[in-house]
UniProtKB/Swiss-Prot annotation:
It comes from the Bacteria. InterPro entries: Glycoside_hydrolase_SF (IPR017853), Peptidoglycan-bd-like (IPR002477), PGBD-like_sf (IPR036365), PGBDSf (IPR036366), Rv2525c-like_Glyco_Hydro-like (IPR015020), Ybfg_C (IPR048479). Keywords: Cell membrane, Membrane, Transmembrane, Transmembrane helix. The keyword Cell membrane applies. This is Uncharacterized protein YbfG. The gene is ybfG. It comes from Bacillus subtilis (strain 168). It is found in: Cell membrane. It is a multi-pass membrane protein. Disulfide bonds: none annotated. One of its GO terms (cellular component) is plasma membrane. The chain crosses the membrane at residues 687-707, 712-732.
Amino acid sequence: MVDEMVLITQQWLNDTYSGKHGYNPVEESGKTGWDTIYGLTRALQIELGISEPADNFGPTTQRLFKPLKRQAPDSKPSNMNFILQGALWCKGFNPGGFTGVFYEKTENAVKEFQKAAGLTTQDGIVTTLIMKALLDMSAFKLVSGGDSRIRQIQQNLNRDYNDYIGLMPCDGLYGRDTNKALIYALQKEEGMSTSVANGFFGNGTTSLCPTLTPGDSRTGFVLIVQYALYCNGKSFDPGEFDGKYGVGVVSAVKAFQEFMCLPQTGYADMPTIKALLSSSGDTTRTASACDTATIITAEKAQTLRNNGYKTVGRYLTGNVRTSSGLTSKALTSKELAVILDAGLKVFPIYQDGGYESSYFVKDQGTRDAYSAASAARRLGFPSGTTIYFAVDFDAYDYEVTDKIIPYFQEIKSAFTKMQTFSTAPKYEIGVYGPRNICIRTSEAGLTKYSFVANMSTGFSGNLGYPMPNNWAFDQFYEGTIGSGSGSIGIDKDGYSGRDSGASNVNPPSDPVYDARLRTLTDILSTIPALENLTSLANAMFEFDTTETIFTSPELDIILSTSLLATIPSEGSPNTITITNGKPGAYITGLLGDTQTSLTASQIDSYQNLLNSLSLSVRNGYLEVYVNPTAESLNIQIKIYTPDIPVGDNVTTGLTTTITFKIKTYKGVPVTSPESELALDWPSYDQYLFPVVGVAALLLIGNMGSDLTNNKGVKVATALSAMLLAIFAYYTS
């Protein structure tokens, strides 16, 4: 919606300052934004004679700015007053017009702003403090979703501590600015000067932090505790903000201490105050839980026990970078036995990435869900175990919306599907990440418990966010304990008791199933377009099924498995025999005349595919069929593995069928099912071209007459067509 007075301001700025050094023209949209605020700021600096105008209201601007106040009648308009009135309009305060003169209505607008900011002095004089706050996008009126009592806190902080914090927003939303302002207020009460106070709860602030008890007369400290309690959740409402440490404050402090698993004294001591204002809280406090990327030996497990730890978080998969290179951080059955034998409990963490926004792309949640559940089942974690999926970066709120929420939606969908398998453990979903991510995934119904990355106190996702209600573990300090072979680096974790961790495991014992699963994984990993789908072959996989594992308007991929591994008929032109991982023929011999349509690199690619498939099969047979229909060209690979080694001279069998269904486009005449199929595939170029590509069409053209007449097709020719079709699709 266009604001006429904002539009007039934008037009005046461009008319007055365009072409002047340091001024950047603003968009004349009638909408307030940083573009307009920066334009007003640069205009002010030009009027102040600053040689190099900039977007920020910095020290030089503050030093040169002189207060503006009501003028005498018949005063001449000035650019300074135009800038002031434009800033007031952008802020939502009505100065009575855009006149360039500072009369009663402009003065009243300034007074209204001073009142909205919580200032005691409401004299209508525009000081540096006022002008700097006006030239900013912060809101000073209660916004949608805001809390009037949070706004009262913000106004009170502006009233009492503006020499430390300037003027902070008064929008009713608890966030980073309010959190830092509370720390500045604490630092002033502790006696720090404006040159020392920094809004960070460091060692100096910690050492000066008071212990407040019922009846404490230090009103400033008590008010800060009252504010902080309310900002951490309405469950900790202390009552009126009156600076009195009464029954309401005692009750709220005890409730907060209980929630954070701190000693429930009712006294606002340093650990309590620091927990109210900083995500990590008192990092010297004891903890009964920890997490580590280090593989735990018997000596390290004893170190954990000796230091009071009862529960430890370990990674299901992955590596960690050390000075000597990449080292596995993955939990093993052997290590798990050591941990449990030491009387420790375990909570599993999944992190094979997640350090930056680019990791969280479509289908990543599905892949991670299957990988995590497969690893957990293989290790024997029982139903009810919560797996914590890591989001290990400071995601902005829009990234949580656009990337993190969809990621966990995919995980939940995959877990729901896995739970339909009768043999699958029923795992719960947890999240590791900053507070905002934990809160939002929980509120969306996507996670049961939160493992909160509170150690990162400077994360925007921690500053100004309360502790999630479903927190299970609270990561707050990194260090090393023990010595010699018992030395181990850990993160100390607060423990709420919501997730007790696993105290026993029951690994599945089915070597035949595992052997088949390994073979299927190996086969999928060798075929282009399927290497990213190997997560389907996980410990929840059910054999003797048929499933479409990829679908699009142009291509479907269908996977079928059978526990019967019948040996194909000898002499079939579609069959290659594989012995000890080697194919019974070379690609050039199989291609025959078809190879004239291919480049040397393409022929090498097909040979490599054939070799890789042969290695995954070890001993068995490979068949390829090409079946054209009115709707699609179907290329089917059948892999027979009749002698999969299990152990102790025991073998098992498996037949894997992968069908690539390359679809035709609408508008192509379709032969009725009753009539003889007589498609002229070479004439389909215009329809297949976007999917299959030129090279594949050449091959299909070479095969056309054989296909139409239902003759056999050489296996290598079919493989070539399949490869080119897939490559063309995935690179188009």
